[in-house]
């Protein structure tokens, strides 16, 4: 069932309910006395108990109000019975709402709310869609980096910086002083050739092996023992050298005497 057919079906029911309500209120107002119309009507919360005795007029007014309330409830039940189950839920939720009796009230009234027309529904849907689009755009802008600020920053950095002659001279002077200080610090940070002169001399006296590596104490001792040779006593080696030299010197004289003896024979 379309929305137009539903509205057309509900319209006569609502008009009947409004007419019943208007007739009941008019009869209740006509029956009241002029002296009691200005006073507010008070009704206890418990409808079953008898009201407190405040006069016969007050009792009659409360009975009329109760009769009006019961009549409104009966008309509402009659309308609900004439509808289908699906239409009853729609009608009770969106079209009819009744006010229950309270401690302080003047009269009973039924508040009927009609469903909004189609053009209002379309406007509400458009507003909801626009709100959703705005929320999505806000989230997108928060997640994305600020590209415009980056572009502006690069453009400002690329622009030339104009100065006068005095400012240019001071800029050059500061740059020269900064370069001089950095060079001085760089030289002071360089490693010296040696920590102290005594250590340098000691390193120069130490024996070195292959590749300029310093030899350990065990390596130095092994090298000295290899140089000394097979004999451990240096005196014996010196005497052996003397004996060998004497033998070499006497050999030419012995050969000459042996040759002379051969000639004589």
UniProtKB/Swiss-Prot annotation:
Residues 21-31, 86-98, 120-129, 254-265 have a biased composition (Low complexity). The modification Phosphoserine is found at residue 52. Residues 23-180 are annotated as: Interaction with the HAP2-HAP3-HAP5 heteromer. PROSITE patterns: NFYA_HAP2_1, NFYA_HAP2_2. One of its GO terms (cellular component) is nucleus. InterPro entries: CCAAT-binding_factor_CS (IPR018362), NFYA (IPR001289). Changing residue 199 to L: Favors CCACC binding over CCAAT. Residues 192-217 bind DNA. The modification Phosphothreonine is found at residue 265. Residues 1-64, 78-129, 220-265 are annotated as: Disordered. Keywords: Acetylation, Activator, DNA-binding, Nucleus, Phosphoprotein, Transcription, Transcription regulation. Its main location: nucleus. GO terms for molecular function: DNA binding; DNA-binding transcription factor activity, RNA polymerase II-specific. Residues 1-14 have a biased composition (Basic and acidic residues). Gene3D superfamilies: 6.10.250.2430. It is found in: Nucleus. It comes from the Eukaryota. SMART domains: CBF. GO terms for biological process: positive regulation of transcription by RNA polymerase II; regulation of carbohydrate metabolic process; regulation of cellular respiration; regulation of DNA-templated transcription; regulation of transcription by RNA polymerase II. The modification N-acetylserine is found at residue 2. Belongs to the NFYA/HAP2 subunit family. Component of the CCAT-binding factor (CBF or HAP complex II), which consists of one copy each of HAP2, HAP3, HAP4 and HAP5. The assembly of the HAP2-HAP3-HAP5 heteromer (HAP complex I) occurs in a one-step pathway and its binding to DNA is a prerequisite for the association of HAP4. PANTHER family: TRANSCRIPTION FACTOR NF-Y ALPHA-RELATED. Acts a component of the CCAT-binding factor, which is a transcriptional activator and binds to the upstream activation site (UAS2) of the CYC1 gene and other genes involved in mitochondrial electron transport and activates their expression. Recognizes the sequence 5'-CCAAT-3'. HAP2 has primarily a structural role in the HAP complexes I and II. This is Transcriptional activator HAP2. It comes from Saccharomyces cerevisiae (strain ATCC 204508 / S288c).
